[in-house]
Amino acid sequence: MSPGIGMPELLVVLVLALVVVGPQQLPVMMRKVGQMMAQARAMAKDFQNSFEEIGRETELSELRREIDALKQANPINQIHGELDKAARGTQDDDIRALKLKHVEQNQAETDADKAAKAAKLAALDSEGPQSTTPEADARADAAASADETERAAPVETTPAKPVDEIKGR
């Protein structure tokens, strides 16, 4: 048997209410009982909805965690990260190679300058003892600075263009 209220039980309750309350107060009392039952159902429904909402939020948070985990485990992102690292490494290697080449060029130029000065000193020593007058020292310094200037800034000469070519005629 089901524990619900059937038709015979409902008739017994109505007859008792009629006897206890009376025929005049019965409609008012039934209205109040109906309102109380509606409030009880509304409260039960709100309670049930709040539990369902908590369940949905929990499911959504779990789904979000799974999506984030999948995004992090995405092989495309891993490959992209590895390619970025490789590109940075290649750029660093290129920069190091250029710096090393520049240092070697500077070292070669410095060695060439030292060799040229040593050759000049050897040539001066082979000419014999010279007087160390200020005029002789000034001439030697001027010759050395002229050689350095020629090596430091090679001058390229280009023929002048006629005015007609410049204006586009």
UniProtKB/Swiss-Prot annotation:
Entry's transmembrane regions? 2-22
Subcellular location, principal: membrane
- Alphabetic keyword roster: Cell inner membrane, Cell membrane, Membrane, Protein transport, Translocation, Transmembrane, Transmembrane helix, Transport
Q: What's an example Gene Ontology biological process for this entry?
A: protein transport by the Tat complex
Function, please?
Part of the twin-arginine translocation (Tat) system that transports large folded proteins containing a characteristic twin-arginine motif in their signal peptide across membranes. Together with TatC, TatB is part of a receptor directly interacting with Tat signal peptides. TatB may form an oligomeric binding site that transiently accommodates folded Tat precursor proteins before their translocation.
Q: Where is this region: Disordered?
A: 106-169
Which Gene Ontology cellular-component terms appear in the entry? TAT protein transport complex
- What quaternary arrangement does the UniProt entry report? The Tat system comprises two distinct complexes: a TatABC complex, containing multiple copies of TatA, TatB and TatC subunits, and a separate TatA complex, containing only TatA subunits. Substrates initially bind to the TatABC complex, which probably triggers association of the separate TatA complex to form the active translocon.
Would you identify the family this protein belongs to, as annotated? Belongs to the TatB family.
Q: Mind telling me which InterPro entries this protein's record contains?
A: TatA/B/E (IPR003369), TatB (IPR018448)
Pfam families the record matches: TatA_B_E
Q: What would be an example GO MF term here?
A: protein transmembrane transporter activity
Membrane topology designation? Single-pass membrane protein
**Localization in the cell:** Cell inner membrane
Q: What is this protein called?
A: Sec-independent protein translocase protein TatB
